[in-house]
Structure formats: C-alpha cells, structure tokens
C-alpha cells in the first residue's frame, strides 16, 4: 500500500536518475510496480519479474497447499502435518505462485507490454536463468537510455493492444 504509492514520488526525488528498474513478483506488488514504471513517461524503465517459485521435490505445491486450512478444519490433516506441508510448498526463494494466477498473469502481461524483456516472465525464481535475466535487464535499460528510448515510446496503444491479445490467448487470471 503505502510503500507502493510512494514509488513514483521516490523515483522523481532522485535528481541523478537516468532510468528505473523495477523488481516485483506477486499479485499486488507487480501490478503496482507496472503502474509506477508506466508513470515515468520520460525515463527508460524496465521490469524484472520475480519469476515463479519452483514446486517442492517432496510435499504439495502452492496450489494444493492453499487448501490446508479447510483440510485441517475437516480433520483431514493434523496441525503438525499442515505446518509441514506449508513449509515445504516452495522449493526456491522468491517468485510467484506455481500456477497461472494473478502474479504469473501480470508477469506475462508486463512482457507483452514491452516493460519486461522477452522470455523473462515466469522464469524459475532464484535460479541462474533468473539472475541472467536480471543482468540482461540492467544492460537493456542502459541501452534504452543510450538511445533515448523512454517508457512513453514503449507503452503505446499497440503495446496495450498486444497485451490484451496475449492475455486473451493464454487465458490468464482476471482477478
């Protein structure tokens, strides 16, 4: 909430900034970061999506774990079992849910808008490929600055139309 609302103000308060990189993952933070970056019309911006959390090698994935409360209430799990399943649901640090919910959808839409590098959405969080995407994003925003390309040049009506078509094609979340 407050932290995200302040982002555009904080970005503008940095007199020497030449570009902005946003790093975000989840349901609320990623769309809010996209809005903040989109408001930086005269600056180059890029989003590094947080990727997807890897599923556990043992236990249940995040989608199934969301039902532990109901299963506990129905005496299908003990409190200890529920706690253990919850702790094992994520096999990598960071990242969004392991299903195409709001966080994953927002990552794909950010890429379709041109705010994120191609093939950066849903990269496995914390893995070498995600770290490489982060490095490439930093290089890309420097290149945008070197060529005078700003967010206004990227977020066009065509970019928004592209994002809508991509969203419809992959059937992303509409929450």
Regions found by a protein language model. Name each.
Residues 1-7:
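Short, small-residue-biased leader/transition segments that mark boundaries at the very start
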Residues 36-175:
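Mobile "lid/hinge" segments at catalytic clefts and subdomain interfaces of large enzymes
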Residues 8-11, 141:
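Generic hydrophobic alpha-helical segments
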Residues 11-33, 44-49:
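A short, small-residue-rich loop immediately preceding and capping a beta-strand
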């Amino acid at each position: 909430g407050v932290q995200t609302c302040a982002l555009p103000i904080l970005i503008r308060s940095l007199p020497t900034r030449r570009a902005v990189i946003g790093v975000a993952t989840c349901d609320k933070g990623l769309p809010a970061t996209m809005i903040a970056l989109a408001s930086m019309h005269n600056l180059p911006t890029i989003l590094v999506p947080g990727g997807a959390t890897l599923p556990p090698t043992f236990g249940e994935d995040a989608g199934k774990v969301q039902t532990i409360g109901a299963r506990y209430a129905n005496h299908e799990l003990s409190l200890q079992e529920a706690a253990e399943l919850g702790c094992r649901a994520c096999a990598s640090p960071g990242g969004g849910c392991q299903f195409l919910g709001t966080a994953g959808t927002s990552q794909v839409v950010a890429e379709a808008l041109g705010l994120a590098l191609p093939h950066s959405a849903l990269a496995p969080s914390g893995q070498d490929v995600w770290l490489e995407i982060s490095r490439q994003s930093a290089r890309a925003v420097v290149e945008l600055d070197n060529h005078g390309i700003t967010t206004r040049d990227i977020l066009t009506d065509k970019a928004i139309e592209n994002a809508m078509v991509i969203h419809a094609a992959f059937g992303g979340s509409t929450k």
